[in-house]
Amino acid sequence: MTKEEKQKTLDELNSLQPLYRNAANAINTIFTTFGKLRQQKFSLWGDHTSLSTSFVPLILKEFPEAKFIFLVRDPRDVVLSYSKIEGHPAQEPIKSAKKWKNSIQTYKWLKEKHPEKVMYLRYEDLVTNTEIQLKEICSFIGMSQADLFPTPNEHEKVRDRLGTE
């Protein structure tokens, strides 16, 4: 994020009326302002970090329409990938195992309490059956594939970004 983007985002946050100064509006303002600054068109935004699994009850309180996609990858592949990144937290197996366990517990809790708000997706399935999995994701979040991929074969670009052929 550039200095100008940070300032614009702070200006937008400061412009929120006191009545609307809450976590949900602050987060929404940050995501939408950043998206607009990058000239991106979107109707949904999301967070792809595992950190958000620690805040699921708060997220549901602030964003009652929130949905969660748990993208799970074979742990052996995760360890192999992250072992190549010097200083990455995944190089500490006990910490990584605790984070993974917390994420799985959160998934199970969501599946039990709010089954309509959670989707389980294996990374390997996304890589090998990209088009099918993207259709399922679109269905889950309530978007058509045409909205998500406005040009033909756009899903192939997703597969390319996943590092597959």
Language-model region placement:
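Short, well-ordered alpha-helical microsegments
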Residues: S52-P57, T130
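Conserved phosphate-donor/acceptor-positioning beta-strand/loop module used by diverse small-molecule
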Residues: H48-T49, L58-S83
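The conserved 3'-phosphoadenosine-5'-phosphosulfate
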Residues: E112-E165
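A glycine- and Lys/Arg-enriched "phosphate-lid" helix/loop adjacent to the NTP-binding pocket
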Residues: I69, D77-K101, D160
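Short His-Asn-centered micro-motif
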Residues: D47-S50, Y123
